[in-house]
Amino acid sequence: MKAAEIREKFLKFFESKGHTIVRSSSLVPGNDPTLLFTNSGMVQFKDVFLGAESRPYSRATTAQRSVRAGGKHNDLENVGYTARHHTFFEMLGNFSFGDYFKRDAIHYAWELLTGVYQLPKEKLWVTVYQEDDEAYDIWAKEVGVPAERIIRIGDNKGARYASDNFWQMADTGPCGPCSEIFYDHGPDVWGGPPGSPEEDGDRYIEIWNLVFMQFNRDAQGNMTPLPKQCVDTGMGLERIAAVLQHVHSNYEIDLFQALIKAAARETNIDDLSNNSLKVVADHIRACSFLIVDGVIPGNEGRGYVLRRIVRRAIRHGYKLGRKGSFFHKLVADLVAQMGGAYPELKDAEQRVTHVLRQEEERFFETIEHGMSILEGALADLDSKGGKTLDGEVAFKLHDTYGFPLDLTADVCRERGVTVDEPAFDEAMARQREQARAAGKFKMAQGLDYTGAKTTFHGYEEIVFDDARVTALYVDGASVNEVTKGQQAVVVLDHTPFYAESGGQVGDQGVLANASIRFGVVDTLKVQADVVGHHGTLEQGTLKVGDVVKAEIDAVRRARTARNHSATHLMHKALREVLGGHVQQKGSLVDADKTRFDFAHNAPMTDEQIRRVEEIVNAEVLANAPGIVRVMAYDEAVKGGAMALFGEKYGDEVRVLDLGFSRELCGGTHVNRTGDIGLFKIVMEGGVAAGIRRVEAITGDNAVRFVQELDARIHAAAAALKAQPSELTQRISMVQDQVKALEKELGALKSKLASSQGDELASQAIDVSGVQVLAATLEGADVKTLRETVDKLKDKLKSAAIVLASVEGGKVSLIAGVTADTSKKVKAGELVNFVAQQVGGKGGGRPDMAQAGGTEPANLPAALAGVKGWVEAQL
């Protein structure tokens, strides 16, 4: 049975049991800031388990794309060297949200495994949590599993609830006892049953974990019952496929074998058991699907994890002898294997291929640049007799140049040097602390709130007269009252304030009554349907239960709405002008501007920018109404509504028709396109490989920008004594004049260098038959210095020369050595001898080298020492 059939049978089985088939969520979690990547099927349902979100179904089944690389759940270093570790895997799961519990979950699992997949019952073992008598009795008395094949597992990890059979997604969140199902490969394979000293062997393989969600663990480790008992199960597709295909390694299943053969094809390797091929086959899945979900290789966060995975794959290609680009060519093979189950992969094939190809090409630049920095640091360390590379240097390589720490450590190891990793970790921690400090007010998520939801009125109203305070927080802790001057978060039962979401910033405004005034500087979501108003109490004492008038800053809201609506029109225009591949990759909409990141592989031309502006402003002039409808997600997408990157959508969505644009959006917008006033793009640039950024302004900001631009044009025209309409022609004339003068100046400098060279030649000192010259050439640039050195080498025949110039407090140095002398006297070493004394460094060829410095006061002494240095080399 092939992997695709196993996946389909799983989903169809649970659909027949009343479950709704739910599409896989993004690998970038939309509802959990504690997770780097989606690493299990339950991630998209976390808020449902917590009671913070409702769904129209109580039973669900999924085939969830998952990644474990980086953070707590990190399998990266094991991938390729074990039978079952992967960076990317598919988790088959069934879920109950307060519907069925342990009994049905266990019976469903047994029926699927033994009935649909026809696994022999005697091959299946199960484990339960030590204290879970209910699950034990269901397995033993109802399913009929013999007692010797049911194993109780207690707290075997050194703490209460720290057990292989007590599951938790992270340090906080939903958790509960679990029951695991194992497959016995038989006595010919070494290993013991779970809980035994030999459990790490390959005989007994876990294939399914049934988690019975009963608790929510908070940051202090406290367990509170979930509002409803729930079921979360997970079965790795790769593991069950290995069992059903009668192989002992996941890499031997049909899906992986196709990718391994493709990797072998691109690397010209015949041995399909080579571990490096397994690494490449695994990594193409993780990298491709991460890019599908909007992750781009970068130097931090998810982008850095992706970059590490890509480079690890390429590094293994090098080990196999492949020196050129190859990794991106495997995308087509992956699409052939998985594009049917995940059409989003097929749709993004061209983009994924391009991003991976660019990252491969940049790999060489990154490694070369990073190596040059590391070599310089190691040379400096060697000159001081040190054996430990400063962790700050390693951190700079990591943070600025995207240089993996493990690669730095490998290079150092070859030189007998270690990396000060504690110092590296300190630098990383310092950076994180700075990031936390910068986001002082961004503390809404994570507040311990269990009260009523907030009803949002902001689409229709800018004022709500009778809002009741349901919770108050100071420094993240719940309080009953706030006094004057305190910063706090206020939760209301009703609000017109829009909470930051979908790229749109939160509202600002005031909460007030006769004795209270609270200034709101930001609005963020505490939970999916709970709004936190962040700010400072300016007057009175605010208590839980108080009733206030909630009023937003209407002018700021209107400006933000103009920019948000313009973003929709711009997105549509970009797709028309640049192509349908344009997808939103991020946005920031505030009162001043809209910043829009999108997938595109080249800078926009001036003509393309003008065309986008023309299209958007035509829609503005059309003054079309904005029409909002609420409908099912699938219906909206089928109707042409655009779903955006990074957004988490429920089963019912808000669809906005605005002019020629139709998008899913929960933000605030203008009533008619004419309310935007004027649209103007003010910036276009690149932010990452394959990602462009546009900034635009609207309304009075756009009018002001155009007026200021017109004033600058008139001022420039006046300075050049021309009319504004003649400005381009006049600038061209001035540029031609400047070029002619620069050419004339260059000729004069060359002539001066020639005459100075003749004069300098007489200053050379004979040292053992070599003419040594070290001098300053006033007013010379680097080009003039180099030309003069070349002429002096020709004139002096056998020579070692250093020429210097000083301009703006900076020293320029050129060293030249004739061919007959360069075996003993190297130009690079000579120029470095001088450069080190003037606060710089340099390098170059044995016959010609260049350097710079920042301490011109030391230059005379440095040049005076050249004769002795050359003498020592001869």
From Swiss-Prot:
It comes from the Bacteria. Its cofactor is Zn(2+). SUPFAM superfamilies: Class II aaRS and biotin synthetases (SSF55681), Putative anticodon-binding domain of alanyl-tRNA synthetase (AlaRS) (SSF101353), ThrRS/AlaRS common domain (SSF55186), Translation proteins (SSF50447). It is found in: Cytoplasm. Keywords: Aminoacyl-tRNA synthetase, ATP-binding, Cytoplasm, Ligase, Metal-binding, Nucleotide-binding, Protein biosynthesis, RNA-binding, tRNA-binding, Zinc. Its EC number is 6.1.1.7. Binds 1 zinc ion per subunit. GO terms for biological process: alanyl-tRNA aminoacylation; negative regulation of DNA-templated transcription. GO terms for molecular function: alanine-tRNA ligase activity; aminoacyl-tRNA deacylase activity; ATP binding; tRNA binding; zinc ion binding. Zn(2+) binds at H564, H568, C665, H669. PROSITE patterns: AA_TRNA_LIGASE_II_ALA. Gene3D superfamilies: 2.40.30.130, 3.10.310.40, 3.30.54.20, 6.10.250.550, Bira Bifunctional Protein, Domain 2 (3.30.930.10), Threonyl-trna Synthetase, Chain A, domain 2 (3.30.980.10). PANTHER family: ALANINE--TRNA LIGASE, CYTOPLASMIC (PTHR11777:SF9), ALANYL-TRNA SYNTHETASE (PTHR11777). Consists of three domains; the N-terminal catalytic domain, the editing domain and the C-terminal C-Ala domain. The editing domain removes incorrectly charged amino acids, while the C-Ala domain, along with tRNA(Ala), serves as a bridge to cooperatively bring together the editing and aminoacylation centers thus stimulating deacylation of misacylated tRNAs. Belongs to the class-II aminoacyl-tRNA synthetase family. Catalyzes the attachment of alanine to tRNA(Ala) in a two-step reaction: alanine is first activated by ATP to form Ala-AMP and then transferred to the acceptor end of tRNA(Ala). Also edits incorrectly charged Ser-tRNA(Ala) and Gly-tRNA(Ala) via its editing domain. This is Alanine--tRNA ligase.
